[in-house]
C-alpha cells in the first residue's frame, strides 16, 4: 500500500484520515450503521483517503474572481490519475459520498454498494417524479 500511495502522490497530494470508521465500536452500533445508506464496505475500512483540490470562490463576471478553467481541468486530470492508482490497488472499496471523487466512474457501487437497489426503490416510492436530485445521488442516473 505504501508504494500505491507514493505513486498516487506523484500526481496530487493525498490525505489519510484514520478517524472515519467504526473501529472499536460495539457490535450493536455496527449493526445499526449497516441499516443506513452508507456503503457497508466503508464500515470495514482502515482509513479514508482524500485526494482533493480547492480554489478561492469563483464568480463568473466578477473581475478578479473568474473561474480558472484551465487550472481546474489540470487539477481534475491529476486527481483522476491519482485516484485510478488507488482504485486499481483497492478493488471493491467504497467511498463516502460527501467527500468522494466528483468524477467517480462506478459511483453507484462505490458510494452505495449493496444498498443501491434498496435506496433506489425507496427513492422511486417517495419521489416518483425524481424531483429531488443531486450529482451521483440515488436516482440521478435516470
Residue ranges: model-predicted function:
Residues 1-142:
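Soluble FAD-dependent oxygen oxidases
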Amino acid at each position: 500500500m505504501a508504494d500505491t500511495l507514493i505513486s498516487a502522490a506523484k500526481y496530487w497530494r493525498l490525505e489519510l484520515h484514520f478517524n472515519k470508521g467504526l473501529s472499536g465500536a460495539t457490535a450493536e452500533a455496527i449493526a445499526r450503521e449497516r441499516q443506513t445508506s452508507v456503503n457497508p464496505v466503508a464500515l470495514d475500512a482502515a482509513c479514508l483517503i482524500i485526494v482533493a483540490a480547492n480554489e478561492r470562490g469563483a464568480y463568473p463576471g466578477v473581475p478578479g474572481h473568474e473561474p480558472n478553467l484551465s487550472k481546474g481541468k489540470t487539477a481534475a486530470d491529476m486527481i483522476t490519475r491519482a485516484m485510478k492508482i488507488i482504485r486499481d490497488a483497492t478493488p471493491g472499496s467504497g467511498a463516502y459520498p460527501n467527500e468522494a471523487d466528483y468524477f467517480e466512474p462506478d459511483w453507484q457501487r462505490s458510494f452505495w454498494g449493496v444498498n443501491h437497489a434498496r435506496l433506489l426503490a425507496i427513492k422511486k416510492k417517495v419521489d416518483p417524479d425524481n424531483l429531488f436530485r443531486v450529482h451521483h445521488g440515488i436516482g440521478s442516473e435516470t
